Amino acid sequence: MLQPKRTKYRKPHNVSYEGKAKGNSYVAFGEYGIMATNGAWIDARQIESARIAISKQLGKTGKMWIRIFPHMSKTKKPLEVRMGSGKGNPEFWVAVVKEGTVMFEVANIPEAQMKEALTRAGHKLGVTWKIVARQGAQ
């Protein structure tokens, strides 16, 4: 699963996923992509399962780009522990996805197969999404 090799701080402040994405908002590398239509934290496990779903459809000629990375750790306190006594330990890693962020891109496979791959991947993500084409691709 994806996670940073090293971070400056173990426990970051919570980053808001509300609002529109400033960058990463168009299909830059492939022909089609999945764009988030609302904001959310996407877990590293969700990214990995979406990657596997796309990989199974691609075959040998298809290419895939993952445009998000889980940079932020999320903390959790142990079960049955009273509130207080500081912040919990880092439990998992998330990517902050805002509305309009392109998360995955694919290329070099037929259009029907491409849309099937992106649809399967989209169902693995905890965010509403739509399939977008590259500008001038059609």
Curated annotation (Swiss-Prot):
One of its GO terms (molecular function) is tRNA binding. SUPFAM superfamilies: Ribosomal protein L16p/L10e (SSF54686). GO terms for biological process: translation. One of its GO terms (cellular component) is cytosolic large ribosomal subunit. Keywords: Ribonucleoprotein, Ribosomal protein, RNA-binding, rRNA-binding, tRNA-binding. It comes from the Bacteria. InterPro entries: Ribosomal_uL16, Ribosomal_uL16_bact-type, Ribosomal_uL16_CS, Ribosomal_uL16_dom, Ribosomal_uL16_sf. It holds the Pfam family Ribosomal_L16. Belongs to the universal ribosomal protein uL16 family. HAMAP family: Ribosomal_uL16. Binds 23S rRNA and is also seen to make contacts with the A and possibly P site tRNAs. Part of the 50S ribosomal subunit. This is Large ribosomal subunit protein uL16. It comes from Mycoplasmoides gallisepticum (strain R(low / passage 15 / clone 2)) (Mycoplasma gallisepticum). The gene is rplP.
